[in-house]
Amino acid sequence: MQSFRERCGFHGKQQNYPQTSQETSRLENYRQPGQAGLSCDRQRLLAKDYYSPQPYTGYEGGTGTPSGTVATAAADKYHRGSKSLQGRPAFPSYVQDSSPYPGRYSGEEGLQTWGGPQPPPPQPQPLPGAVSKYEENLMKKTVVPPPNRQYPEQGPQLPFRTHSLHVPPPQPQQPLAYPKLQRQKPQNDLASPLPFPQGSHFPQHSQSFPTSSTYAPTVQGGGQGAHSYKSCTAPSAQPHDRPMSANANLAPGQRVQNLHAYQPGRLGYEQQQQALQGRHHTQETLHYQNLAKYQHYGQQGQGYCPPDTAVRTPEQYYQTFSPSSSHSPARSVGRSPSYSSTPSPLMPNLENFPYSQQPLSTGAFPTGITDHSHFMPLLNPSPTDAASSVDPQAGNCKPLQKEKLPDNLLSDLSLQSLTALTSQVENISNTVQQLLLSKATMPQKKGVKNLVSRTPEQHKSQHCSPEGSGYSAEPAGTPLSEPPSSTPQSTHAEPQDTDYLSGSEDPLERSFLYCSQARGSPARVNSNSKAKPESVSTCSVTSPDDMSTKSDDSFQSLHSTLPLDSFSKFVAGERDCPRLLLSALAQEDLASEILGLQEAIVEKADKAWAEASSLPKDNGKPPFSLENHGACLDTVAKTSWSQPGEPETLPEPLQLDKGGSTKDFSPGLFEDPSVAFATTDPKKTSSPLSFGTKPLLGTATPDPTTAAFDCFPDTPTASSVDGANPFAWPEENLGDACPRWGLHPGELTKGLEQGAKASDGVGKADAHEASACMGFQEDHAIGKPAAALSGDFKQQEAEGVKEEVGGLLQCPEVAKANQWLEESRHCCSSTDFGDLPLLPPPGRKEDLEAEEEYSSLCELLGSPEQRPSLQDPLSPKAPLMCTKEEAEEALDTKAGWVSPCHLSGEPAVLLGPSVGAQSKVQSWFESSLSHMKPGEEGPEMERAPGSSGTSQGSLAPKPNKPAVPEGPIAKKEPVPRGKSLRSRRVHRGLPEAEDSPCRVPALPKDLLLPESCTGPPQGQAEGAGAPGRGLSEGLPRMCTRSLTALSEPQTPGPPGLTTTPTPPDKLGGKQRAAFKSGKRVGKPSPKAASSPSNPAALPVASDSSPMGSKTKEPDSPSMPGKDQRSMVLRSRTKPQQVFHAKRRRPSESRIPDCRATKKLPANNHLPTAYKVSSGPQKEGRMNQRVKVPKPGTGNKLSDRPLHTLKRKSAFMAPVPAKKRSLILRSNNGSGGDGREERAESSPGLLRRMASPQRARPRGSGEPPPPPPLEPPAACMGLSTQSSLPSAVRTKVLPPRKGRGLKLEAIVQKITSPGLKKLACRVAGAPPGTPRSPALPERRPGGSPAGAEEGLGGMGQMLPAASGADPLCRNPASRSLKGKLLNSKKLSSAADCPKAEAFMSPETLPSLGTARAPKKRSRKGRTGTLGPSKGPLEKRPCPGQPLLLAPHDRASSTQGGGEDNSSGGGKKPKTEELGPASQPPEGRPCQPQTRAQKQPGQASYSSYSKRKRLSRGRGKTAHASPCKGRATRRRQQQVLPLDPAEPEIRLKYISSCKRLRADSRTPAFSPFVRVEKRDAYTTICTVVNSPGDEPKPHWKPSSSAASSSTSSSSLEPAGASLTTFPGGSVLQQRPSLPLSSTMHLGPVVSKALSTSCLVCCLCQNPANFKDLGDLCGPYYPEHCLPKKKPKLKEKARLEGTLEEASLPLERTLKGLECSASTTAAAPTTATITTPTALGRLSRPDGPADPAKQGPLRTSARGLSRRLQSCYCCDGQGDGGEEVAQADKSRKHECSKEAPTEPGGDTQEHWVHEACAVWTSGVYLVAGKLFGLQEAMKVAVDMPCTSCHEPGATISCSYKGCIHTYHYPCANDTGCTFIEENFTLKCPKHKRLPL
């Protein structure tokens, strides 16, 4: 409920916008189906849960805390892990807020009610602080059981139905009450006034998800959906209403009822609302009408998705928002991020999200709730008033009043009823839909109605466009969307916003963010001065402070506000097209929020905005677009945006308002992010700087964008970049600002994805960022890409509605929705990567650094062009284009804050003129994708990692490189982002005029290419690269497919392939250097970069000669290859900056998503998920070739990507690989299209299989390495399939798909080696395979981390290599390769076969490699690869490409989140290299994959490779790669199998064999390893089994040395000995303490009861005095029972072993003793011991490795021993703290054995304390040393205190003879020195040693 409510809060603004009307019909259709019932019921249940302890618990912390703090904390919490709990609890809080809210009426008040401020609103029962409020709400809930139950129910249900459940209960009410209530009308009326307050808090959230706010504002049904959340709001209002019977009581009661029982509540609500409508209609209508208009527009933007959703049944919608159904466009948009991204994390997050948002509301509304109330009702009240309004009614009324909302409107019953309505908004989804649609048709008229209908809360719901973002999702699936939207969807939509923006927590956070921003901003002139809609939006934004916590909320708010003016302005001014209008409306909806946020932020950043003021208008729009996309576009925007865009009823005034609002939006965003995060501050600083710079650039619009970009590089820049920036901005925001803002990437499209990042950034920027980033973002990939698309669209619309309209027009409404989805997906990709890069706030800091660095680069490259760009953007068309470019530039800018300006300018220059000249649709679309791509690629990657500088350097240098070669155009592309942006700009700006039609395809390509060139683009360029990133982000996986599609389009020109070889070298060398230098020293690589830019042009050229031949890349055919190469180079560059690569990868992913979106917007089917795999690639290709197919194919892809996005959370499970493949094929167009699509399908499936698994791990555990693995796998799959033009090969994927779903994890593990092998084999089947595999390996190695390096060496090789070899090399540049392959496919047959073969085989190997790395990651091998950026960099350098490549891939996939992004590219490169040798086997790739599956040989090879990788990864990564390479070559040659299914078998067979061999290695011939460890001693290690080889030896040795050294220092007797052995001898296993070694073993003698066991030291039983349990059994190493199977044998063996090994033990003991006495002894002892032990272990047989304990404890053996007893490890008793501490922690303390012989078993059990404190006893590597000696001494040593034998703890004072039992020493008062585990007797404890 909170989620919903928060959405409502956002939607409060949005509800004010009549935009809801736009989506009304759709939402209604969507919601009416049965969603109402389901939703309501579910919401009821959820409401119960929400309002029950869980919600309160989750949120009470949030609400109880000061609003701001709570908001932040809650947001964080909800971001981190409480997403479920906190989200939901927050939602209940929200509901509570709503309950008190009506009294408070402004949504912000409601939000405030959430926080401490809420008590004022709940005058009747003001509780202290937020908790009081919460309790109050709880009480109110109690009073109003329905809402209480409903929300609590939602809380419980929400976990599995985060949004669906959350929303459903309200939704059920909705259908009942909505249909009859027709609340849409009231909501529309009230939407302006009443929804505002509601939207401000919960209603906004409500609207956000249902259609209430965004969709509801668009459609009353949507509004009602929001009101479902608003139902929560109603509870919030109920505290108000309770006190204010007439006003608040009605609304709250009804709302609560609505929440609880949709029909009754609905009816009552309707009646009340109607009554209220009559009363407040005029007042509310007046102010709220405007607001409602804007709100609704924003909501309509949100309603964008409803078209998609509308088709969905309630169940479908639920599914949409359920992990499985997160495919549904609306759901994907609105909910997918949460569900799709990380079903568990996000869903829980979303669940918590509502609660968290409540806290945000609380934080934003309590601290900024007033402001937010204002902002929500900012329509009416001033933020201060809202915040200050203690009186629920007065406060709400005042804020509303201040916002020109009549006081009585707030206090009025109608307002209250509106609040109730708001609470019912979820339940009103259908009615709200209708109303919103009607409102969309008649914005003002309906707006008035809505004003009346929707009380401030409702208004809040509508006004809360940010929440409306969730709304977007909700309207998308109004019926189903609405119920989930109500709470879950609202949460999801909002969370989607947040997901996209900040993760599942984001919805609430963003809601609060918006509220907070608006609230904090309200005071800011911008929010108030913006426009009433903006004010409303500001209300949503609430306050910059809150925004800091919930930047996304603020952002959404901003969106809501921004779109109002900007969007209506642009919509009305730009296009008449209904689609555009829909988009405009959707934008407007978000514009309101954006405006609010913008105002809030602008006020905050007014200083920065002073110069950017002129720009803000244009910028504001883009931010709004982003925001709107985030909110509206996420759920509704994607689906509904097309629809809202269609209704051109968006009033021009709104549009105009939007412009104004946009203005502030950027600055506000910019400013708020600084507030939100520490990094934001730097960004903020940068922002002003950037602002100054950008304004300097010359275009007002671009300037603000850049400014925004600077602060929130992507987001603000998105403002300036309009269409392009929405994605660029969110990505940057995500990476930089989002974390800085809480949810600031509030651009719901980008914002959602970024919101996840931002929210993560806020609360758990790092933890959640990885998780949300990987999980949410993957989710975002579905919703966010749509949102991103929408946002992109909207932003572009804001900048140039024409472009947006063009984009929208490009595809039908549905197509548009799909496009939005697709774009959103792409954006997601970028955002995801941004998320990844943003994973750590430090990353953001580094981003700042990098951005500054990038800034310089941008200035270098973009300065000249930037100014022109800015100038160009000045023109409406140019600005759009410019915006897009600027978005990219902004991304670049983001990398370097200073750069943003230049970058923005540069992109703007490129974009602006072309955009104006070119068809706006394509241009806009391209712009959208372009900015998405660059933003994703550059900003995310660059901004996220500490390597940001490198990443940016990579990106910037790449773009710079392209810029140099391309001249002005290339120059624009030079910066990574800038390059991507410029690439797009070049396409857009330069070629746009040339290739207007192909511009869109070109742009996607450009997006891909620039990104590839930049580095993240690598993933895009590489079919695999994108998937890699997708995997990395989870969403990127979706994006990956899209990315692949996008990247594929870039490869239309086979000539480019040939050309490609050289550019990669150039780019690789130059860019690599740049990356390495960490500066934007990409200028030298401008040529290479130019290639990437050209690829963008090339793809365009493929589509249309002009584009291909544009200045950017005159040589279209040859250039594409070049571009591809460039992309690869970037890819390589990425590896160099592993971290950056990771981010870039996500960015790339995003960018591909953008591209795919463009291409795939038409595909709206759920199957698009499959298509996403193949469709994006294929469609990318097709789009490149055919512009027209792009929309259709794009649409298909759009859905597919959504599905994929969903699969991020539940992608794999929902759709079997086979099914996906089939769907993919089905969705594939005609012959060529089908073929391509099929090819893509296969990769998509492969990728998806790998991707979902990887994505899931990432999402669940925030394991960047696994996600990177996924991206590589996905990249490979994509690359393979896309590379393989032949669809036949792609067929393999389906089988794998089917199996993959079940054995996804296994497949993932196996896929790496299998695919690698397959690819290698495919490539290696020919005689040239050995070399080819080496190349692929190298490529993978060099592609991401060593993209530059590898390219330097391999890239050169590529050009150097003759036809086939260069081709192989080209494939090595997989980034390019994916597109290149497509290009090849399209172009020359010879090239095509080669390219295809290379791509396919390589792709497969890439996939295999990616999966292998993942497996390694699981094994922990990733340490070498995942962690090793260096290894990644090494990869290219090492001449062990095969094995290295797998390692590298593993590294890139695992270790590099960046490598993830780069990993995708890198892996594909590897694939390319591997398959390169078999150019003609592009099609055989699939069969090969299958073959791989089939033959055990292949499996074994794969496994061997994996094993080597695993084993060598940590230590022998380089050596292992050598072996692996040969193996891989063999595998490649021998395994022409499909890697899809064989992977599983390979994994099982190889893994098992491998593991067994490792563990047993019986055939291994023993040898003595002589190592000179120290100058003093020679260490001999007897290696009796492979497991004991150096690696294991060294590990135990070092740990032993460490332990022994530490222990020896502490040990009195063997101190010197131990130290020496530890230092010199100990490093060798034999050099471990020379004392007897005991290993923790299994309990062999079960006859020994615990009661009869005594400590072998003190002879006391367990728990004697305070000694605790006995630890053990410890066996002498020679007597250690052989594992469990050999336990029985062990008794027998122990006899012989004991006989043989006891002497050895004694010998060792003697040696140890002598070592103690003699320094030289340790050496002898060491040598002797190893020999003796070796012999002993040999007799022992297989058990000996485990028994080799002291001498050569194998890692395996050690781990086994350690595993036997967790406490035994890592503790050493010796003199040193570590050893001693280890010992204490371990079992050492409890090693009590019957005695040394201890019967047959030789079991020794000891008390931990005894072992730890006994001198000479220490635990090393799980082995207990000196225990036997200590036992011998203890037998005769009487205790000084009790005089009993067994005393082992001696006074450490020199000469002191006191010895005690540990308990006696305790009793005696001895002093225990834990530092070295020594003891001082009472006599000496005060004396110095």
UniProtKB/Swiss-Prot annotation:
Signal peptide span: none
Comp. bias (Polar residues): 13-24, 201-217, 382-391, 524-546, 1486-1498
Start-end of Basic residues biased regions: 979-988, 1412-1421, 1504-1516
Renumbered zinc finger spans (C2HC pre-PHD-type): 1762-1817
Main location: cytoplasm
Mutant phenotype after disruption: Haploinsufficiency cause obesity and craniofacial abnormalities. Homozygous mice die during gastrulation and organogenesis. The few surviving mice experienced postnatal growth retardation and most of them died before weaning.
Protein's UniProt keywords contain Metal-binding: yes
Keywords for this protein: Activator, Biological rhythms, Cytoplasm, Isopeptide bond, Metal-binding, Nucleus, Phosphoprotein, Ubl conjugation, Zinc, Zinc-finger
Residue ranges with Pro residues bias: 117-127, 1262-1271
Residue positions, PTM Phosphothreonine: T455, T679, T1051
Superkingdom of source: Eukaryota
One of the GO BP terms on file: circadian regulation of gene expression
Modification sites for Phosphoserine: S322, S328, S551, S666, S863, S875, S1047, S1105, S1332, S1343, S1400
Cross-link for Glycyl lysine isopeptide (Lys-Gly) (interchain with G-Cter in SUMO1), residue positions: K802, K884
Chain intervals with Low complexity compositional bias: 322-336, 1015-1024, 1084-1102, 1378-1388, 1597-1609, 1720-1732
Region (Disordered): 1-39, 53-130, 143-248, 318-365, 382-401, 446-505, 521-554, 639-698, 922-1297, 1322-1539, 1583-1614, 1720-1753
Zinc finger motifs (PHD-type), residue ranges: 1837-1885
GO MF annotation: an example: zinc ion binding
Gene3D superfamilies with a match to the protein in the record: Zinc/RING finger domain, C3HC4 (zinc finger)
Feature: compositional bias, Basic and acidic residues: 933-943, 1146-1156
UniProt cross-references to PANTHER family, sorted A to Z: RETINOIC ACID INDUCED 1/TRANSCRIPTION FACTOR 20, RETINOIC ACID-INDUCED PROTEIN 1
Free-text function comment from the UniProt entry: Transcriptional regulator of the circadian clock components: CLOCK, BMAL1, BMAL2, PER1/3, CRY1/2, NR1D1/2 and RORA/C. Positively regulates the transcriptional activity of CLOCK a core component of the circadian clock. Regulates transcription through chromatin remodeling by interacting with other proteins in chromatin as well as proteins in the basic transcriptional machinery. May be important for embryonic and postnatal development. May be involved in neuronal differentiation.
Name under which the protein is recorded: Retinoic acid-induced protein 1
